């Protein structure tokens, strides 16, 4: 579960390393974000000489959470970290690579470009 002030790792090569969630996109009363939700975040740590810089406000989609994700078939998926992929206004990733595994639920939420870049889909 991701809420405002949560720190996340970045799972792509866009230039950001750490993000802090500041808002969850959707209904005004959303308290937590889960896998596949879009958030507004601020970059807390970035790689030098890259397009994205520190203290820049961006959009990102959650691809991994420490909180368990229960599927309809009874399978439970849990990751070791909270991670997100930086996206633009149209929902396309800003980076050209995605690191680590991502959940299959992103394909159902029309993030097919992110799914195609991922090395492993669980």
From Swiss-Prot:
GO terms for molecular function: large ribosomal subunit rRNA binding; structural constituent of ribosome. Its main location: plastid. InterPro entries: Ribosomal_uL14 (IPR000218), Ribosomal_uL14_bac-type (IPR005745), Ribosomal_uL14_CS (IPR019972), Ribosomal_uL14_sf (IPR036853). It is found in: Plastid, Chloroplast. One of its GO terms (cellular component) is chloroplast. One of its GO terms (biological process) is translation. Keywords: Chloroplast, Plastid, Ribonucleoprotein, Ribosomal protein, RNA-binding, rRNA-binding. Gene3D superfamilies: Ribosomal protein L14 (2.40.150.20). The keyword Ribosomal protein applies. Binds to 23S rRNA. Belongs to the universal ribosomal protein uL14 family. PANTHER family: 50S/60S RIBOSOMAL PROTEIN L14/L23, LARGE RIBOSOMAL SUBUNIT PROTEIN UL14M. Part of the 50S ribosomal subunit. This is Large ribosomal subunit protein uL14c.
């Amino acid at each position: 579960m991701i809420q405002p002030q949560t720190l996340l790792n970045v799972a792509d090569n866009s230039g950001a390393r750490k993000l802090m969630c500041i808002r969850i996109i959707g209904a005004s009363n959303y308290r937590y974000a889960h896998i596949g939700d879009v958030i507004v975040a601020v970059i807390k740590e970035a790689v030098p000489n890259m397009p994205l810089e520190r203290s820049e406000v961006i959009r990102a989609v959650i691809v991994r959470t420490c909180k368990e994700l229960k599927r309809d078939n009874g399978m439970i998926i849990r990751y070791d970290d909270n991670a997100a992929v930086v996206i633009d206004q149209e929902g396309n990733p800003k980076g050209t690579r995605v690191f680590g595994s991502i959940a299959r639920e992103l394909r159902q939420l029309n993030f097919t470009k992110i799914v195609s870049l991922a090395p492993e889909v669980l």
